[in-house]
Each structure stands twice: as C-alpha cells, then as structure tokens.
Amino acid sequence: MDSTLIKTEVIDELAARAGVGEKVAAITERAMQGELDFQASFRERLALLKGLDESVLSDIADNLPLSEGAEKLISTLKRLGYKTAILSGGFNYFGKHLQKLLGIDYVFANELEIENGKVTGRVKGDIVDGLRKKELLKHIAQKENIALEQVIAVGDGANDLPMLSVAGLGIAFRAKPL
C-alpha cells in the first residue's frame, strides 16, 4: 500500500503530524541498514506516535495521494474478474479507506490501538511483516481457489520479498535498494 498503491508512507505522515518526523526517519534508516528488524523498528516508530489525536488519521486518509494509474489499474482488474488485496505493513485504518474508495476485496494490515480518541503507540494483534504477508497471500489464494502460479503480487521493500517469492509474478514497484 505505502509507496505502491499510494505515493506516501503513512507512518511518515503520522510522524510529521505528531512532531516526531526526524526521529521516525532515523529509526527507518537504522532498519534499512539492517540494525533493526521490521518488527522492532515498527514498534519503536509506533511508540513515538503515542498521544496523536484520532482525527489526524481521518484527515490523512482523506488526503492520501494515489499513485498514478492506481484507480484505473484496480478498476480494470475488477472488471476483468480479478480479486484484489492490500497486504501491508502499514495500517488497517488507511487500507480500509482505500478499500472503500477503490473496491479492494481484501485488506490485511496493522491495527492501530486507539483509546479515548488517542493513538496509544501500540498495535492490536500480530504485526503484518514479510512472513505474515506470505501467509496471508497463500490464505487468500486458497480461499479463492486460485493457484499461486496465477497470483500477481506487487511490493517495494525487503518485507515484501517472502510474498513476492510465492506469487506466480512478483513485481518490484518503486523498489527500495536492499
């Protein structure tokens, strides 16, 4: 979803609004350098969002910049009978927004914990990382009776590699260097 279906990284948008953009960027850089794994870096970045007002999520969701051609791609796939899914290490709140906007069939992402209208800095449930994306892709294919060889997956980062490796066609879109 982030930097693929949409042009931005939502966690960076949230961090900027929370006044912790530089701190989050530094943690992201450490993760890119291999100093932190995805789950550790995700939890560390998320903790910095503690106290962010829930209204910020709605504002960001309403202004998500879709990647060029995203609407046409999804509508064409839907018209041709394809099933579509968002499997994201980002946030469910924004995936669900895009699901309504574009008619996506499935959304699996991290659920932000919100209490009393504020982000707690924690996520509910398991973190959607690379291995979880792979499991979810296989689950959807099985549920829809689609052979993995017939699956197309699109991703941009190292945490997409497990998912891309099991798809019949794995596409690196705006890929980050490994």
What are these regions (language model features)?
Residues 35-56, 60:
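Cysteine/selenocysteine-centered motifs that mediate thiol-based redox chemistry or coordinate metal-sulfur cofactors
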